[in-house]
Amino acid sequence: VHYVSACRHDGIPVLSPDVNESGTEFTATKEGVRFGLAGIRGVGTGVAQAIIAEREAGGPFKTLHDFVERVDSSQANRRVIESLIKAGAFDSTGYPRRQMMHFVDKNNPENIIDAAVKRQKDRASGQTSFFDMFGDVEGSGFEVSVPDPDGQEWDRHLKLSQEKEVLGIYVSDHPLRPFEYALAKARDFSFSQIDTGYEVQNPTGGTINQEIPEGKALWWAGMVSSVSKRVTKNGDPMGIVQLEDMEGEATVVVFPKTYKEAEGYLYGEVD
């Protein structure tokens, strides 16, 4: 979160992972810093390297169908592909994430992963199909059957929550974006400033970093991202609360007395 915040503070865009552009780790591009494939939960370095190797050997992936046909299913299995979709790694192909998840849904009898696995097994056993004898994927019937993008995307909240699930942070957007101005007005400092300090003008010129004094009371504004309810030895409820703003996050322990007073405010979500 702090890395992303620092880049954005310096005017450097942080871009979602992309199967056609990402490296294994963060990569500098003309447009900004591209999130690495290995940083996606459930993908890992080995799978990322296999994807990059196929991209370099066969060129950019045209569609999700093209991807599952070309990348070994033992490397990029259903779980990996679902994580890539949630992370936005196929967004550049022009298909909504919702539609692509339907393409790979195991409950979809026409899901493309089962079809690709069968084709790869047939090739490995020397059983080539009629179409395979006449050319590559583009002429095989697999690519021809790809439907057009339907334009039906998940709602913003679901899309972002799944993105954070696999990336650990929000990259393409943030749930608090519509409230950014109001939050800045309501708070004294952001979590990033609390953690690393903030810039102030130097009387002799330029800026210097000013740290926030220990023990200083201040106002903070953001959202509760998770609450873990605990019970003390005396049986009193308390909470471990994860707070988050657009620049950072922090874990706060809410002891029984305060928890009893604030419990009703510690649940809910920003749409």
Listing of model-derived features with the role each one plays in the protein:
Residues 1-211:
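Sliding clamp-binding short linear motifs
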